Amino acid sequence: MGKNKALLSLPGNQAVTFIEHLVSLLEECCSETLIVARDQAHAQDYVFPGVRVTIDETPGIGPLMGLYSGLSAIHTTRAFVVAVDLPCVQRALLSFLLSQPLPTDTLLVPLVHNIPQVLLAIYPRSILPIVREQLLQGRHDLRCLLKVAPVQFVEEVQLLQNDPQLCSFINVNTPEEWRGLF
């Protein structure tokens, strides 16, 4: 995309960035808010009162390293993970996912069009050894965890009750996708 997506403005509110919106939303629902930054330069852009920032243990490896770094840094038993390029996460969906009963070692992953939405999911801290093993095997994509860790999927019909347009899963990766939000 050529620029830090976290600092792009939200549709309908040019004064609020993706990261500001997500931090505000997560602070309402979660006991701890942690941002995982790619590197020190990005971390400097993510200073918010009461929010900790950690840096990828090995920059440039991808989302799986981000998850590993985040799970290593949290003080809670699980993390609600939201990618910064999902700027339209709905509060009702977030609350619904967080309210789901879940065994302590199980991932909670929404399904949209039968595709696992690993960038908006709940990950238990207890899977750190599994994540580490996947990294050591050269894997970088969060989807690899779906084959090696216990997973509870949330069906689309349940998601639609809390996010009728499934806006929460709109991923912004290109300037065209960002402009399409407006």
Spans of features found by a protein language model:
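Nucleotide and nucleotide-moiety/phosphate-recognizing core
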Residues: M1-S168, R179-F182
